[in-house]
Amino acid sequence: MPEPQNQEELDKYLDNIITQAEKRLDKVFASRLKEIKAMINKLFEKYSKNGELTYADVVKYNRLEKEMDVIKQNISADYKTVLKMLNELLETQYVDNYLRSAYIYEMYTGRNLGFSVPSADVVQRAVENPIPLLTLPKVLERQRVELINNIAMAIAQGLMAGEGYSQVAQRVHKRMQLSLAKARLTARTEGHRVQVAGRMASAEQAAKKVNMQKMWSAALDTRTRAGHRKLDGKIINMDENFKSIYGGVGKAPGHMHMAKDDCNCRCALIYVIDGEIPSVRRARLSDGSTRVIKYIPYTEWEKQKKAS
């Protein structure tokens, strides 16, 4: 991918990094699911009678408990991997957006704006969620415990219902997919929050020497939530807050302190230098691809879509 030359291109570049992280999560969960299915198949092969395996058969001699101990250890190791993976993602999102935004501001203004590489302490403070219960380790720990309990329950319920291997494996598959979806949502939501934090920090430094305002830029497609469509194109001063119809109030997308605003938000924060808004923006087509169009607010784009 070519080097980003403006804030729109930079957002696409950073979003692609999050997408790649989501794909790595897919591989972690797919590998674990494959091993758990193999374990279930082994139980059926060793202890079933005429293809039927009862719950009593697997609890005898702690057979299921021993297998669940192994599953618990393996899933715990997986979540340590996920935590490391997501911490690296968040650090990349912050530092990349900070430095690349700094480059864009300096190239645009033709001035040295006094930027330096953020220290490890600054990055760590930015990465950590300010709400104690929503820090990455605590969120992933809740997801880990939930997944282990759900797998144990899925196997037990399937066997007590007299189901065969395929049905029990399908129960486990559904539980794993739900946990994967939560892990992906965590990566997307936290990645976006820290990504925007990097740009805000960069803009605060630039604003010491140039006139800057901030503008909400909604994702230009039909999946954008109604409240964020209304905020699209809204320009406010650096020290002001955005307010959404959902009750969120905050400095930027992903920082509205309201789950209905922040979870899986795809909006961007664009900085307006000397009152000049971007001339182009990226829109998503019906086939999922994107293209660059002349800058128009979301409401105007929506009218054009309905008329076409």
Swiss-Prot record:
Its main location: virion. Keywords: Capsid protein, DNA-binding, Late protein, Virion. It is found in: Virion. One of its GO terms (cellular component) is viral procapsid. GO terms for molecular function: DNA binding. Coiled coil: none annotated. The keyword DNA-binding applies. Binds the viral DNA inside the capsid and the portal protein. May control the DNA exit from the virion. Monomer. Interacts with the portal protein gp6; this interaction targets gp7 to the procapsid portal vertex. This is Minor head protein GP7. The lineage of its organism: Viruses, Duplodnaviria, Heunggongvirae, Uroviricota, Caudoviricetes. The gene is 7.
